[in-house]
Amino acid sequence: MTTAPRAEKLTLFLAEDEEGTAILLKFLLERGGYTVVHAADGQQAQTMIDQMPPPALVLLDIMLPYLNGLQLLAHIRQKAEWQHVPIIMLTADSNERDIEQALAAGANDYMVKPFNPRELTARLQRFIKVAS
């Protein structure tokens, strides 16, 4: 994952409970020059979201313990200061109903796991450019 040099690192928020996926994503994103804040479950993610400034982008797993990704998405979209933050939903299965619900609730995009690192990079760069 390569990105253009920046004066400061952009922060991305990752909510992912599957340890292997979280480690891989953090590695790819940090190697790409981003700072990654990670939550391992929905409850932890909600607490962190309530305490941190808005990141450049959110990667949000749909199937999280305690609060699922759709519940977190609704929580994020209710926060005025997070309204502009792009959100990419991550899903292990391409359940059309979940994807439609996520997009209708305010997600900007979704990716089905496993995903191609180059595709992830392209989507991140597209949304971060649009948001800035």
Regions found by a protein language model. Give the residues of each.
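Conserved acidic carboxylate
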Residues: 16
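Charged docking surfaces used in two-component/phosphorelay signaling
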Residues: 23-31
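Acidic, metal-coordinating helix/loop segments flanking the phosphotransfer/catalytic sites
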Residues: 38-57
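The feature encodes the CheY-like receiver
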Residues: 65, 83, 95, 113-114
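Active-site residues of response regulator receiver
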Residues: 61, 91
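C-terminal output helix
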Residues: 115-125
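Short, glycine/charged-rich "phosphate-handling" switch motifs in NTP-dependent
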Residues: 108
